[in-house]
Amino acid sequence: NKVQTVFPIFFFFLLSQKSYFCLKLFFMLKAGVLGAGHLGKIHLRLLDQSDQYELIGFYDPDKKNGKKVESEFGFKFFESIDALIDAVDMVDIVTPTLSHYDCAVKSIKKGKHIFIEKPITNTVEEAENIRALLSVHNLKGQVGHVERFNPAFKAIKYQLKNPMFIETHRLAEFNPR
């Protein structure tokens, strides 16, 4: 009988779909964002749309801006950096470069994976210290060098294997942020 054969398969499919959803929720990293400026809002939106992360919220030292972003976009605003870091598995650091090092060290020492907008820090020594701390604590860290996803780079990828010559131009001034 087809019904007797198909029903258990269909039931298994439904069960496996629900199990997959439950497992996915169980294994999703809880993410938090430090910084709610222009780039911070972009990171918040992208993390919120991701199916790999559960966006827990964000912290911004400017409480007025934090409350504004919370009411405008609906993301939870944490009033202290420690409260946010304690609530997540992964910290996305989108603050001014001068504070990257302190935010990273604080997050790593609390056992959190990190993503840092570029540049990683102001000095090579600070960057090397972050790398060493990540290694000691067996954590993952990544710097936001995302140009590899830029459609222009993707379009010429095949040409890079046998270039005649490559010339690049910077069209905007360096912004130290």
Predicted regions and their residues:
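Hydrophobic alpha-helical signal peptides and transmembrane signal-/tail-anchor segments
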Residues: 6-27
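N-terminal Rossmann-like dinucleotide-binding module
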Residues: 28-72
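Beta-loop-alpha module in the N-terminal Rossmann-like domain of NAD(P)-dependent dehydrogenases
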Residues: 43, 73-131
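Conserved acidic residues
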Residues: 56, 89, 164
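Histidine-centered beta-alpha loop that forms part of the nucleotide-sugar donor binding/catalytic region
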Residues: 96, 119, 144-146, 169-171
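Rossmann-fold dehydrogenase core element
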Residues: 129-146, 163-168
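Predominantly a Rossmann-like dinucleotide-binding segment in NAD(P)-dependent oxidoreductases
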Residues: 147-177
